[in-house]
Amino acid sequence: MGTSSILSFAADGTEKTLSALTLDDVKSYYENHLSPSVAKMSFVGGLDQKEVVASLASLEKNWKAKEVKNLSTEYLASAEWKPESKLYFIDYPGARQSYILIGKSSMSIKAADAYPAVVVNDKLGASSQGLLFDILRLKHGYTYGAYSNFTQGLYNNYFAARSSVQATVTKESLALFRDILSGYGNLYSQEFLDQTRETILRTMYGSFETPKALLGMLRMINAYDLADDYQMQRVQTLKAMTLDQAKEVIAKDLNFDDMVIVVVGDAKSQLAGVKSLNLGKVELVQNDATK
């Protein structure tokens, strides 16, 4: 990825870019990238469509639609995730905790295996009932929590497992992450799948009873061009999913060998231990924020 990718820049900017921002830049952005033509609106409430449209008449009159450039398509669609190293250690001198992040690029929300991936992640790290929390927190006491998730949209899609651990057990914690992730496919069982199915179905049926929840569903349909019945499609996928299918998803989308590791911590005391795990090429990165 590196500094050549748009993904290497914070979305809210840096001190340098913010300092250089001018009023003309803001006006130019408004002129070239903001328009009702790229806006999407979702509504839940006691008004019918005719009443909602009427309430927007003044906005339609005073803010004329025009074609503008979609920056998401221009930058994110072409962004590549090709790290040069397997493990990046970001030095934070004197840190009493180490932050561990392990991940890989993944599928978009519209991919066939998008929801199955969410299903298999449930027992891995979706909550405090997952293996990561159970082993790193409850069994070893290395952290207050350890979790994993798939972030799915149209462009910047990835899997990530993470935790903040005591600095003195950085090596041990990273070894546990490796063992859990690399062994998850063999460990995953019919019992895991049945428990996940029961948990998700129980919560899903009652999760769209409020206007706010319904609005969230409409926003998903709007933002990602999903089918109107995408939630019911997910229910059917979950009910029909087999253990073999789950294991196939794990092998494809949770392959530890494809993942990149980032550790933020005190390099003086922890880097040697991390290197001793022989997880691949290690690159030491100096943290400018600590200077």
Residue ranges and their predicted role:
Residues 102, 111-125, 131-134:
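Active/ligand-binding-proximal structured segments within catalytic/core domains
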Residues 26-29, 41-44, 56, 102, ...:
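Buried hydrophobic packing residues in well-ordered domains
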Residues 35, 40-108, 263-291:
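An aromatic/glycine/proline-enriched structural segment found at the starts
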